[in-house]
Amino acid sequence: MKLLVVLCCFFAVYSLAAAQGGQEEFQIKVRICGRHLARTLADLCPNVEYEDVMKRSGARSPALYGTVGWPWARPGAARGKRAGVADDCCVNSCTMDVLLSYC
């Protein structure tokens, strides 16, 4: 319920700012994390469901590590750090345009 109120306030202020076209354009930045971020994306993006956003990658089988010849390697150890919606909207503040770009 709190999230709905926050989103309504966010959209109201965003709409007021967009309505003043002759003045300098500004965008409100918000910081949203965790389940609130997932719920917001699910609400903003019509083709994304909350359960899909909250799913994590499936566990990898330890038996696979030996097949590539690196039994000491951990899953994901070779992957670099990827920036994503959590970096854009939780670590840093993001605008409505940034949120919509993840739809």
Swiss-Prot record:
Tissue occurrence: Located in 4 pairs of medial neurosecretory cells in the brain.
Signal peptide start-end: 1-19
GO molecular function: growth factor activity; prothoracicotrophic hormone activity
Recorded GO CC terms: extracellular space
Domain of life: Eukaryota
SUPFAM superfamilies attached to this UniProt entry: Insulin-like
Keyword tags: Cleavage on pair of basic residues, Disulfide bond, Hormone, Secreted, Signal
Family: Belongs to the insulin family.
Protein name, UniProt field: Bombyxin-related peptide A
